[in-house]
């Protein structure tokens, strides 16, 4: 028969067998009282705790995936954006340097020919405006013709039965007549606009031809400079469009990131509100901060304020230590002050004297490093009661 040896804690372990490790930061769970009839275990397995309900909520995993995807996209697109901006600045500096070098070689002919190229630019813009005005005028004419056809159809419907006036056809006729009037006004406005921009385009082209005759020699000498300038301008416009597109992608990814984060906060608030709505907190259940919360559960604010108000001016005496098996009575817990515990934790690096409170309080907070001593467990520095 295996020899039994006494170990600390009152348990007897046969010689040659290993004692299972005891994780000290886990709060012992109180045994669940079985209901009459032996159905207690089945009901406890069927009913999930709020913590398990949080972990099993599929919305959290889905929103976390959205959050991670948006974060990865933001990082990738921002890298591309930085590279595109660097390329744009490099091309801009290189073009300015080459244009300055070309201008120093050509001399004053560039300034003499500049009015001609400026007039060409204005003439090109006027030509584009003329094309846009022509498209608007054609659209207005099409709408006017369609409205007139609608009026014709409505008149035929009204005159179909001379003995009776159909209110539906009458309403359609009135509506079509209004459309004809609006389309007529739009057509006249488009026609006037087209005539105006056409005159401007003709004036710009006439000025270009006049300057070309006057500055023929300077234009010929400065042609390489302005051709190089037009080439660099086109390249810079392309890179500028790329930078603008990447900026829009970054803004959209950040918007998706914010939406996912907001959804996580809403889910956390819903879960926490559901937990606050429960009648009591089970003794063996650890209370954790909701997803996305800074520190400490919101549901314990009322309890914390009640303890602080009830224990104002009182606290635990220094040097009092609760053993592993000792549990504080109700009077001691009612006089426990959160401020006293916090100051005590700042003075010492061990919370050995708080182990007995695990059955009555919920410890939660950031983990501290390994405890000084022979045990390898971890303890919590900040607690919430």
Curated annotation (Swiss-Prot):
Residues 318-328 have a biased composition (Low complexity). One of its GO terms (molecular function) is guanyl-nucleotide exchange factor activity. Residues 59-140, 169-272 form a coiled coil. One of its GO terms (biological process) is intracellular signal transduction. The modification Phosphoserine is found at residues 30, 49, 343, 350, 358, 362. Belongs to the SH3BP5 family. This is SH3 domain-binding protein 5-like. It comes from Bos taurus. The gene is SH3BP5L.
């Amino acid at each position: 028969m295996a020899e039994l040896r006494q170990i600390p804690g009152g348990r007897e372990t046969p010689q040659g067998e290993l004692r299972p490790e005891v994780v000290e930061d886990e709060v012992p769970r109180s045994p669940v009282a079985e209901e009459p009839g032996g159905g207690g275990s089945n009901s406890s397995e069927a009913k999930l705790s709020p913590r398990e309900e949080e972990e099993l909520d599929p919305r959290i995993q889905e929103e976390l995936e959205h959050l991670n995807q948006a974060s990865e996209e933001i990082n990738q697109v921002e890298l591309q954006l930085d590279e595109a901006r660097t390329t744009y600045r490099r091309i801009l500096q290189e073009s300015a340097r080459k244009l300055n070098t070309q201008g120093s070689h050509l001399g004053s002919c560039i300034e003499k020919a500049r009015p001609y190229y400026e007039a060409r630019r204005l003439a090109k813009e006027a030509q584009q405006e003329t094309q846009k005005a022509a498209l608007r005028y054609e659209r207005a004419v099409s709408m006017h013709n369609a409205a007139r056809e609608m009026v014709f159809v409505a008149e035929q419907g009204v005159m179909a039965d001379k003995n009776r006036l159909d209110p539906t056809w009458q309403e359609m006729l009135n509506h079509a007549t209004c459309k004809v009037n609006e389309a007529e006004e739009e057509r006249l406005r488009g026609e006037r606009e087209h005539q105006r921009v056409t005159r401007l385009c003709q004036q710009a082209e006439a000025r270009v031809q006049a300057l070309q005759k006057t500055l023929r020699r300077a234009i010929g000498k400065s042609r390489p400079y302005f051709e190089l300038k037009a080439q660099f301008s086109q390249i810079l416009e392309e890179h500028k469009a790329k930078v603008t597109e990447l900026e829009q992608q970054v803004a959209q990814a950040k918007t998706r990131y914010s939406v996912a984060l907001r959804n996580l906060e809403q889910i956390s608030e819903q879960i926490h509100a559901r937990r606050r709505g429960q009648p009591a907190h089970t003794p063996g259940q650890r209370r954790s901060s909701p997803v996305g919360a800074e520190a400490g559960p919101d549901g314990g604010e009322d309890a914390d304020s009640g303890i602080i108000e009830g224990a104002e001016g009182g606290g635990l005496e220094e040097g009092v230590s609760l053993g592993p098996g000792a549990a504080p009575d109700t009077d001691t817990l009612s006089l426990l002050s959160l401020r006293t515990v916090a100051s005590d934790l700042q003075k010492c690096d061990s919370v050995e004297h708080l182990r007995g409170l695990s059955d009555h309080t919920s410890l939660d907070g950031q983990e501290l490093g390994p405890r000084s001593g022979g045990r390898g467990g971890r303890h919590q520095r900040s607690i919430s009661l």
